[in-house]
Amino acid sequence: MSLWKKTLYKSVCLALALLVAVTVFQRSVTPGQFLQDPLPPTPGPAKTGNLVNPNSFWKSSKDVAAPTPTVPRGPQVWDVITTNCSININLTHQPWFQSLEPHFRQFLAYRHCRYFPMLLNHPEKCAGDVYMLVVVKSVITQHDRREVIRQTWGHEWESAGLGRGAVRTLFLLGTASKQEERTHYQQLLAYEDRLYADILQWDFLDSFFNLTLKEIHFLKWLDIYCPNVPFVFKGDDDVFVNPTNLLEFLSDRQPQENLFVGDVLKHARPIRKKDNKYYIPAVMYGKATYPPYAGGGGFLMSGSLARQLHHACDTLELFPIDDVFLGMCLEVLGVKPTGHEGFKTFGISRVRSSRMNKEPCFYRAMLVVHKLLPAELLAMWDLVHSNLTCSVKFQVL
């Protein structure tokens, strides 16, 4: 039976099991066991301190990274246990604030709320010898994407080869954005996590602007529970990843390097058109360009740099575009992200209808390709791992 048929069968079985689970949970569990009262429009406990307001492919030449500075350890457990976030009253009466769109007013009014309690945690993922942590941003409703990733590129390895340790996978989630659906989806997620034990979840709403929260929460979690992991791959739940190529790329890399590799955008300008998803008002960011940043659903970094990023990000005000925010954090450290042709932000070809975007020989050579639907990912994974004969060998290592 082919992989996609097996996955379809498993998904059907899991769906039936979830329906049964919901019935059981609804009879035996109160909603409060999984969620606190609904959060304010946007997130968490206030962060104190002085914050800065920021107004051949694979083996190609690489920068020699400076030695990683010593970073003091933070708390040894997740130390945020309550949600106590109130609106920033000082902003609400400012004329410039009132002129903004509602979602920007909400973001700014609660931007000081940085960290939230954990609902699901798996520190055991970093027990033993772990070489690379694969971390996937997801949302509570996208079970099908998580299931396909577990069956394909997110499958865990006990050894990365060449004497290296294990490869472990985690999914990062907030809570359901619609209050009326929250209890239902939380019960389903609890059941999913009992099956797979691979979900990190925090008590903030999953939304586009809260993706930045997901970044800083993971960096804090990594610093607490996984401080010695050599490398981290972080991606979205709609990308194709070739883990074999990732590991080959890392084969001559050192964990002490300030490594941050992806599809890097340089001299990107803030978008000022209000109908664009990535629109940013000038009052929120007045500079002509963003710092260099890696976009497009996936990047690779050393664990030592991730720890530095955690502390660097804590010196900045939150920014609503997560990729750009990480670029700002890198700028604080004086680290420039490295561009790599094996990371494809907009598909292998920017022309969506191009045959190249459906050519498995290209996917076999890449590290990360964005973006694919679950069925497309399954089909491409099967093709790439079949007895595929390519007329031209693409050298990307």
Swiss-Prot record:
Its main location: Golgi. Keywords: Glycoprotein, Glycosyltransferase, Golgi apparatus, Membrane, Signal-anchor, Transferase, Transmembrane, Transmembrane helix. It holds the Pfam family Galactosyl_T. It comes from the Eukaryota. Strongly expressed in placenta and colon. Moderately expressed in lung, stomach, small intestine and kidney. Very weakly expressed in cerebrum, cerebellum, heart and testis. Its EC number is 2.4.1.-. It is a single-pass type II membrane protein. Glycans are attached at N84, N90, N210, N387. The keyword Protein transport does not apply. Residues 1-6 are cytoplasmic. Residues 27-397 are lumenal. GO terms for biological process: keratan sulfate proteoglycan biosynthetic process; protein glycosylation. GO terms for molecular function: acetylglucosaminyltransferase activity. Coiled coil: none annotated. The chain crosses the membrane at residues 7-26. It is found in: Golgi apparatus membrane. N-acetyl glucosamine (GlcNAc) transferase that catalyzes the transfer of GlcNAc via a beta1->3 linkage from UDP-GlcNAc to the non-reducing terminal galactose (Gal) in the linearly growing chain of N- and O-linked keratan sulfate proteoglycans. Cooperates with B4GALT4 galactosyltransferase and CHST6 and CHST1 sulfotransferases to construct and elongate mono- and disulfated disaccharide units [->3Galbeta1->4(6-sulfoGlcNAcbeta)1->] and [->3(6-sulfoGalbeta)1->4(6-sulfoGlcNAcbeta)1->] within keratan sulfate polymer. PANTHER family: BETA-1,3-N-ACETYLGLUCOSAMINYLTRANSFERASE, UDP-GLCNAC:BETAGAL BETA-1,3-N-ACETYLGLUCOSAMINYLTRANSFERASE 7. This is UDP-GlcNAc:betaGal beta-1,3-N-acetylglucosaminyltransferase 7. It comes from Mus musculus (Mouse).
